[in-house]
């Protein structure tokens, strides 16, 4: 398959774009770090998890495999994956600390949250490792990251809809995660990683389209639910006012 005109131009001027890629790498690192600390802040503020179990555990599993088992596949991030793995280990501790508030109706899960999060993380790590063995670390790093990004985009939508509440949700968190994700894709393109299928690949186009749709759907869901919460709060205030007058 012939390479696209855009890809050919990028490869031709790769050296000139190296500084751009380096700047984007730093910017992406800042965005993802802000995303993780925003998770901590939101979870501590609302006392419930700010992210779902599957996105979080899959991220940690992917980061562990490509930070310590296949570090060469993530070498273009210059140690960033290891930093994110360590930060995620802090995040998951605070998430589990507040997760019991969501499981009052299921005591068995509530009593075994550390085991649950641990076994799911190990399961995803084994899956990521198996996939890397199957297709190679370079391609595994890319498509394993695709799964991370897809779950990171889908999970918050499922979470906010199932809760029917904006508690534990944050528009800032989603904004920096979305921005960081697409900076990451741009870096892959500029660095010309040989394993990357990039924009001429139907699968890559599907991934970009899917995550864009999901990321633009989230603020709509947030706005609709938040507006309903404000309406309900206003109704409760009026009821209290009437009750006070009647008394």
UniProtKB/Swiss-Prot annotation:
InterPro entries: PaxB-like. Keywords: Glycoprotein, Lyase, Membrane, Transmembrane, Transmembrane helix. The chain crosses the membrane at residues 20-40, 51-71, 76-96, 112-132, 141-161, 179-199, 205-225. Pfam families: Pyr4-TMTC (PF25129). One of its GO terms (biological process) is terpenoid biosynthetic process. GO terms for cellular component: membrane. GO terms for molecular function: lyase activity. It is found in: Membrane. Pathway: Secondary metabolite biosynthesis; terpenoid biosynthesis. It comes from the Eukaryota. Glycans are attached at residue 164. The keyword Membrane applies. It is a multi-pass membrane protein. Its EC number is 4.2.3.-. Terpene cyclase; part of the gene cluster that mediates the biosynthesis of andrastins, meroterpenoid compounds that exhibit inhibitory activity against ras farnesyltransferase, suggesting that they could be promising leads for antitumor agents. The first step of the pathway is the synthesis of 3,5-dimethylorsellinic acid (DMOA) by the polyketide synthase adrD via condensation of one acetyl-CoA starter unit with 3 malonyl-CoA units and 2 methylations. DMAO is then converted to farnesyl-DMAO by the prenyltransferase adrG. Belongs to the paxB family. This is Terpene cyclase adrI. The gene is adrI.
């Amino acid at each position: 398959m012939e390479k696209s005109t855009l890809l050919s131009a990028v490869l031709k001027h790769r050296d000139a774009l190296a500084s751009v890629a380096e700047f984007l790498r730093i910017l992406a690192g800042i965005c993802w770090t802000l995303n993780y600390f925003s998770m901590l802040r939101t979870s501590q503020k609302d006392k419930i998890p700010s992210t779902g179990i599957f996105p979080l555990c899959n991220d940690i599993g992917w980061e562990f495999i490509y930070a310590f088992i296949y570090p060469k596949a993530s070498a273009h991030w210059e140690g960033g994956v290891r930093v994110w793995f360590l930060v995620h280990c802090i995040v998951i501790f605070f998430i589990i600390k507040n997760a019991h508030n969501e499981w009052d109706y299921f005591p068995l899960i509530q009593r075994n949250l550390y085991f649950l999060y641990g076994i799911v993380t190990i399961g995803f790590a084994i899956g990521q490792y198996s996939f890397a063995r199957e297709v190679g670390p370079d391609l595994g790093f890319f498509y394993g990251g695709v799964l991370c990004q897809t779950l990171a985009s889908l999970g918050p939508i499922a979470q906010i809809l199932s809760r029917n509440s904006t508690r534990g949700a944050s528009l800032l968190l989603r904004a920096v995660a979305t921005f960081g994700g697409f900076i990451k894709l741009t870096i892959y393109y500029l660095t010309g990683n040989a394993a990357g299928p990039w924009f001429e690949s139907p699968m890559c186009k599907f991934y970009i389209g899917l995550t864009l749709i999901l990321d633009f759907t989230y603020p709509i869901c947030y706005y609709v639910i938040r507006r309903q919460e404000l309406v309900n709060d206003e109704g409760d205030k009026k009821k209290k006012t009437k009750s006070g007058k009647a008394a």
